[in-house]
């Protein structure tokens, strides 16, 4: 019995063919085979916005050959990517090939490994027409907005300008932010910053003026004159530790990546634009040759909003953590992350397909971009399974001539997941530890320096790739 399997890319076709073996002909569609013709609107507005599709120019011979292959095969499987676009491509292929839409010939692979491919082939289903319609709605909106607004913008503003369903909204965000920046009026403020030692300790630590002893409100200094007045009040003052408060806090790991968070973190850490990130991720998903392991997909499908991971993947990750770091780095109860309630949960978060294959093991087999993205995905996934970081916090309150200074810091008591990975902020920096020296109430401190520092309030930052991806996607929590 001959079986035809249609996927999207040649690399994916080659790898899947290797897992399926004889009896399967695996061909690549090279993406979409039908689309709305560019020469006209191709949407019948008067008849419920019906789209008018045509075979993409240059693919006529491919479609002709594909029809012959489908007619000769005993069964046809549609194995395009597991997202809206992939579902739509399968629907277009089924339409062109005359396949029964109710037949279970649609298969999806969350990962391009032998296990992932064979599991997908064991669970065929009918084409999800709701998923197809979601893609069609987006495509029709793209066409309506682009074709209706672009000529107007080109005529009224500048020749060659265009509008789009996504780009116009993004442009609005950028313009609104720019208007905020232009309207912003900076306000002057000052801080009083000091450095102390606690003899015989030589290492100094920093503290900032917080307020007055008899006034719990935070002090606000708006001019150099006010700053100089406070510095004058503190001349010759004795600095005494009034209180030392200690506590503990737990720092939890962030979830494994979804599409938007992968793009954000790659932008922060690697200065990658989204296109570059997704290109490398697509290649890692479709499969690469890894020395000692053959050809395999290194990560799961990279277009996802789900934070779910399979129990098999969790077990494999836990085994790696136990073997590499020890059992104390595994939490007593497994950690589960909650996805947003309105997402498609058909596949998992972005994770390594084989957690035991470390980034260093693939470094010599993949491109630089592929290595960097795999390292991000692998570290984030493994860290998400690990124990919390435990920190001891300390707050020192120092009094002098009626003024109060505060110093805060922490020491790491157990590094937990941070032994492997820490998420960076929008400035590309991780939180730095600032341990404080041992002090107790009543200790007299030695002043090393004290300065008044001028500052100005800052306007909102202009959008970077990272901030633009982040704006519509609030972070999800864990349980």
What are these model-predicted stretches?
Residues 1-467:
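Toprim catalytic domain recognition across nucleic-acid enzymes
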Residues 469-478:
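Conserved small/polar residues in nucleotide/adenosyl-binding loops
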């Amino acid at each position: 019995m001959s079986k035809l399997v249609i996927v999207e890319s040649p690399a994916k076709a080659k790898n899947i063919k290797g897992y399926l073996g004889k009896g399967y002909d695996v061909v690549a569609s090279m993406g979409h085979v039908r689309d709305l013709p560019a020469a006209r609107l191709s949407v019948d507005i008067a008849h419920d916005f019906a789209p008018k599709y045509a075979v993409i120019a240059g693919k006529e011979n491919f479609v002709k050959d594909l029809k012959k292959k489908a007619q000769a095969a005993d069964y046809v499987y549609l194995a395009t990517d597991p997202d809206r676009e992939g579902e739509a491509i399968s629907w277009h292929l089924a339409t062109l090939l005359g396949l029964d839409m109710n037949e279970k010939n649609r298969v999806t692979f969350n990962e391009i490994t032998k296990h992932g491919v064979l599991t997908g082939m064991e669970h065929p289903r009918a084409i999800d027409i709701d998923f197809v319609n979601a893609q069609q709605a987006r495509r029709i909106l793209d066409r309506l907005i682009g074709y209706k607004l672009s000529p107007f913008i080109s005529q009224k503003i500048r020749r060659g300008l265009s509008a789009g369903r996504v780009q116009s909204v993004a442009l609005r965000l950028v313009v609104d932010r720019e208007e905020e920046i232009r309207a912003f009026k900076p306000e002057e403020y000052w801080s009083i910053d000091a450095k102390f030692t606690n003899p015989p300790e030589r290492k100094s630590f920093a503290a900032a003026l917080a307020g007055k002893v008899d006034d719990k409100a935070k002090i606000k200094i708006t001019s150099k004159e006010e700053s100089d007045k406070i510095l004058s009040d503190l001349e010759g003052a004795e600095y005494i530790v009034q209180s030392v408060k200690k506590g503990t806090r737990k720092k939890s790991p962030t979830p494994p990546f979804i599409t938007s968070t992968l793009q954000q973190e790659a932008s922060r850490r690697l200065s990658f634009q989204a296109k570059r990130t997704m290109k490398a991720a697509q290649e890692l998903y479709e499969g690469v040759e890894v020395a000692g392991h053959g050809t395999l997909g290194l990560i799961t499908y990279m277009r996802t909003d789900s934070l779910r991971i399979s129990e098999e993947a969790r077990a494999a990750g836990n085994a790696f953590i136990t073997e590499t770091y020890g059992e104390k780095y595994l939490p007593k109860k497994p950690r589960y992350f909650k996805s947003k309630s309105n997402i498609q949960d058909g596949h998992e978060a972005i994770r390594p397909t084989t957690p035991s294959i470390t980034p260093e093991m693939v470094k010599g087999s993949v491109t630089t971009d592929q290595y960097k993205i795999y390292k991000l995905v692998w570290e984030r996934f493994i860290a998400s399974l690990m124990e919390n970081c435990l920190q001891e916090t300390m707050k020192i309150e120092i009094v002098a001539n009626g003024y109060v200074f505060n110093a805060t810091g922490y020491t790491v008591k157990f590094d937990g997941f941070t032994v492997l990975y820490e998420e960076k902020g929008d400035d590309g920096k991780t939180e730095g530890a600032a341990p404080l020296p041992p002090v107790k109430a009543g200790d007299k401190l030695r002043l090393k320096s004290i300065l008044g520092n001028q500052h100005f309030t800052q306007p909102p930052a202009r959008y970077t790739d990272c901030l633009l991806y982040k704006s519509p996607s609030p972070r999800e929590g864990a349980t």
